[in-house]
């Protein structure tokens, strides 16, 4: 599982010009589910993101986690993160999990965050979405569950 975590002061997802999810302070997570991702990948990703100290404390030092700040998550499925661009000029998505399995893993990921008490909203799986955010910092992190 590949996740791009972007610290934000606000983020929202729209489908057909209608806002479907919106958060204030927290993280926008773009998530790509790869073939072979399992419950352990979800656990590692949730563990890392929920405890990652990437929010400023009162001294301006990155020292607080999403749990500490009581921030929100906006989780958006993005299979293009699994794209392979090594050969040719068009990405190959053979490493992306099937839509049906990806949906289950995506929903499970969000539920795991909710079980920790983190307000977690999502995009609309499989839909063409417009994602907007105000990136704070900017602070953007790449998390690959296979490297944790």
Where are these regions (language model features)?
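A charged helix-plus-loop insertion that forms the helical arch/lid used to bind
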Residues: 86-98
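Acidic/glycine-rich phosphate/pyrophosphate-binding loops and surrounding catalytic core
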Residues: 101
């Amino acid at each position: 599982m590949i996740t791009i975590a972007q610290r934000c002061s606000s983020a929202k997802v729209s489908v057909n010009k209608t806002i479907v999810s919106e958060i204030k302070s927290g993280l926008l997570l773009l998530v790509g589910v790869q073939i072979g991702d399992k419950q352990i990948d979800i656990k590692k990703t949730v563990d890392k993101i929920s405890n990652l100290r990437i929010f400023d404390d009162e001294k301006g030092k990155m020292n607080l986690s999403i749990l500490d700040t009581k921030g929100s998550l906006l989780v958006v499925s993005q299979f293009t993160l699994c794209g392979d661009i090594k050969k040719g000029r068009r990405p190959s998505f053979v490493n992306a999990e099937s839509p049906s399995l990806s949906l289950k893993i995506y929903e499970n990921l969000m539920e795991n965050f909710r079980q920790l008490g983190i307000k977690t909203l999502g995009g609309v799986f499989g839909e063409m979405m417009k994602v907007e955010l105000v990136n704070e910092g900017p602070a953007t992190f790449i998390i690959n569950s296979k490297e944790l």
